[in-house]
Amino acid sequence: MATGDLQGKYQKLAQEYSKLRAQNQVLKRAVVDEQANGTALKEQLKMKDQSLRKQQQEMDSLTFRNQQLAKRVELLQDELSLMDVKGKKTKKNMDTSQLSQEQKSVFDEDLQKKIEENERLHIQFFEASETHRQMESELTSRLQELETNTAQHQAVVDGLTQKYMDTIEKLQGDKAKLEVKCQALEREAKDCRLRTEDCQNQLKTLHTDLSSRLDDSLVIINEKLPFNDTRTSQLNALNVPVHNKRYQLKARELANQGLSFVRDLVTALLNFHTYTEQRVQIFPIDSAIDVVSPLNKKFSEYLHENASYVRPLEDGMLQLFESITEDTVTVLETAVKLKIFSENFSSYVCFLQKILPYQLKSLEEESEFSSGTSALRSRNQELHKDMQKITAVFDKLKTYITLLALPSTKPEGLLRTNYGTILTQISEALHRLHDISQELSKHYNNKAALEQELPAATDKLKTTNDCVLSSLAALTNVTSKIATFFGNNLDYFISSLSYGPKGGRGFTNPLSAETMLVYKKKAAQYMNNLRKPCPASVPYEEALVNRRVLLSSTESREGLAQQVQQSLEKIGKLEQEKEHWMLEAQLSKIKLEKETLRIAALIKGTEKGQLPEVPHDNALLLDAGEHGKGNSTETKSTSLIGMLTVTIEDLQAPDHDSREELIKNHYMTRIAELTTHLQQADSKAVHLYAECRALAKRLTLSDKSNRSLTEETKYSVQSISKLQDELITTKRSYEDQLSMMSDHLCVMNETLSKQREEIDTLKMANKGNSKKNKMR
């Protein structure tokens, strides 16, 4: 199922990508057209600049020609003045004066013509410069507008390309993830195949074993239980039936599937009635603009109450599903909750019958609407018939479901022989409901297609029609599922009615079912008492591994214990040697002090001139100091604290009290050291106990934090689901924005075509003006 969902999502993403790619191509074409228009306008501007330069050159040439003519006129005037002076002086040359007068008149005429021509050229140049200036200003303003539009379009195209690249990368990543998941699923499929093969082999072995056991048990039953008499059906009705757990599990599974189908049916009916209410508020008269007719107003009020009739269907089916458990017996006589579902279904059918006249009148009102065509009227007639048919089918289903609910409340109200007939009639009615809903969806689709062509059709009406069509498609789908489900399980429903005591006619009332359940509980309790729990065992391979680990650990433990014992013995010996050498050092200190005192006394005696008598012990000490310790005999004294070696000379020494005092001091210091060690050990134990308590507190805190983290993970999962819903909504909004952008691009293309037409008309007008100027 996960791979199917992922493939469906991937296909949706691919479709969205293809749509976005097509829109991107449209945007690119529009941008290319804008760029072409911009280049054409730039070329036109260049041509206008060239024509302006030519006219300026002509103007310069004309001004130069005018200056030349003015100079020539001045020269001619000078010549005329000279000729006049000569004519006054000489009256002889009359003929020449006449000739000069004729030349002067000719020059005057020529000058007048040149002046008129110059004036006409000035006027033409001024008009041409004015028209050119106006054209240049208009074209520059249009060029700026087009450049801004092209920049905007380029920004939109860049943003869309970036978005498409991101979507492509995301799709590629999703594709890689899907490939990895497919590989993992293929591996799991291989493992599952191997497991199924093993399970099939085990099933075969178990089947053979159980079949042999069944044969043996049947032989024993036939031999050992000949007293069971099942000939008289009246007495067999008193038999306690056997509880079939497999039958109950199958019934619960079918009830669960029926509950899911009823939920889908409830959602489809809710959507259909809700969208029908919205359509009545919009067409043929929009409630936001004008007052709706009283018929449609009443019809919309009734449709607004659809949830109170439709949702109880799901509640009744849910109660029926919850009443079917492993510890119950499910037949028509014990299915008490079926009565609730029957009552809810009857109330919904009454609701359909109540709104049917209003729905038919509403269709007639739509047909009488002024903008309705003959085809639309025929579609309304088809819907008129379909609504009557679907209400009749629901009424038929209500009758059969009410009959099925009778055995649980009134067993005498329905004969047991009619159960199978009623179930087959329900199956046929469900198939008929699917066919009628399919025809209704088809006819409504044709009607919606005709209504979209009407001039009075608004966007709100189109979207509402799409919603109604989607709800009808969902209704058709769920009715087909229910019909196929009921048809496939019809044999099971009919065969399950024979579930009852052995040799009997079935359940007559729910008391036998309760008795059977009581005996079942007693039998289960008896078997639990007989069954002794097996001692907990360990698998053989795991036991071998544990034995190896145990042997290795015991060997290592023994070796470590020996090492510890040896190290403890070494430590004891070293401590004894330490004590011995410490006592030796103290005795040597005492001897040194005595020798120093004796030497001091000898020095004093020598100073006085007397040689004191050396005692025997001191002589022996001197001999021992001179000859060494080789001849002296030693005695060893060993205690728990240490070992003490004392020579005979030391024992014979007169200062026993001082030696005992030293030994006492040594032992006291040793006891003090041991007490300090003991106190340190106690403090360490207290510290370890505090650490253990702290660790216990940390463990409790970690448990609390773990619980809080699990709650946070639940909240995070909920937030992830919310974010996924927000992602879906944002995706839909982006799709709407893209559709709006495509519409905007279409409008921009239309405006660009209009601008092209205007530019062409201006070109034609410019050409006509230029021709008129040339004609002038």
Curated annotation (Swiss-Prot):
Cellular component aspect of the GO annotation: early endosome; membrane
Q: Which domain of life is it from?
A: Eukaryota
Q: Name one GO molecular function term.
A: RNA binding
Predominant location: other
Say yes or no: keyword RNA-binding present: yes
Alphabetical list of Pfam families matching this protein: KLRAQ, PPP1R21_C, PPP1R21_helical
Point out the coiled-coil segments of this chain. Answer: 4-206, 432-466, 555-597
Q: Which residues form the signal peptide?
A: none
User: Localized where?
Assistant: Early endosome
**Annotated keywords:** Coiled coil, Endosome, RNA-binding
PANTHER family under this entry? PROTEIN PHOSPHATASE 1 REGULATORY SUBUNIT 21, SMOOTH MUSCLE MYOSIN HEAVY CHAIN-RELATED
The entry's free-text remark on domains says:
Coiled-coil domains of PPP1R21 are essential for RNA binding.
How this chain assembles, per its entry, is: Component of the FERRY complex.
Explain the purpose of this protein. Answer: Component of the FERRY complex (Five-subunit Endosomal Rab5 and RNA/ribosome intermediary). The FERRY complex directly interacts with mRNAs and RAB5A, and functions as a RAB5A effector involved in the localization and the distribution of specific mRNAs most likely by mediating their endosomal transport. The complex recruits mRNAs and ribosomes to early endosomes through direct mRNA-interaction. Putative regulator of protein phosphatase 1 (PP1) activity. May play a role in the endosomal sorting process or in endosome maturation pathway.
Official protein name in the record: Protein phosphatase 1 regulatory subunit 21
Organism per entry = Xenopus laevis (African clawed frog)
